[in-house]
């Protein structure tokens, strides 16, 4: 099964049908913006810096598209950090990420994750229409959409794994640029016994 969720736990997934609200009112969206791009950013940056000594190579490629919406594909190697590793070099552009329903199924954390930018995969045709509409809307508003196309979270793995080609339909249909972020793990320290994340940014790619 080429799907996964960030939580790492067995959770009864929330039903994402036509009643699920992908689009919210102004107040909800404003609070999401504050939470996503202001209040949480120091935590994201601090965690990435002190836990992983993260380094990004190729940030200038993304900066050239700061006035345009685009898609980002990332390898899936961290449960928690994967939710924000792409957001740091993309900032201050708002970054949304596609997740499985399990990620928003535990209250009250599900709402928090939604406000941080999670867009759950739809469960039926009616929900799919709303899902595609919100992706189109976010891209038109010059936001970015992050997709983890690989199967399961394999911690610290840097090889290429199989993934569903259907995950690439979004940039093809919307004719928008696509970037790739590849998280690698490199040793450092006096005894070469510590690991840091070095993220390589490539693109843009066009269909």
Named regions from a protein language model:
Residues 7-58, 108-115:
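A transmembrane-helix-recognition feature enriched in membrane-embedded lipid enzymes
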Residues 53-207:
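Soluble catalytic domains of membrane acyltransferases
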């Amino acid at each position: 099964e080429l799907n996964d969720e960030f939580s790492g736990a067995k959770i009864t997934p929330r039903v994402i049908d036509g009643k699920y609200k992908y689009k919210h009112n102004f107040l909800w969206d404003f609070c999401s913006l504050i939470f996503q791009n202001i209040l949480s950013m120091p935590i994201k940056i601090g965690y990435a810096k002190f836990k992983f000594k993260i380094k990004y190579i190729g940030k200038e490629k993304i900066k050239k598209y700061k006035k345009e919406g685009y898609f980002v594909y990332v390898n899936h190697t961290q449960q928690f950090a994967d939710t924000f590793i792409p957001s740091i070099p993309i900032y201050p552009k708002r970054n949304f990420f596609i997740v499985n329903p399990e990620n928003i199924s535990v209250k009250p954390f599900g709402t928090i994750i939604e406000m941080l930018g999670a867009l759950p995969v739809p469960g039926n045709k009616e929900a799919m229409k709303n899902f595609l509409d919100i992706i189109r809307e976010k891209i038109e508003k010059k936001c970015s959409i992050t997709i983890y196309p690989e199967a399961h979270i394999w911690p610290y793995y840097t090889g290429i794994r199989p993934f569903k080609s259907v995950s690439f339909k979004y940039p093809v249909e919307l004719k928008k640029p696509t970037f790739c972020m590849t998280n690698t793990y490199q040793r450092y320290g006096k005894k070469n016994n510590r690991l840091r994340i070095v993220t390589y940014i490539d693109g843009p790619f066009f269909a």
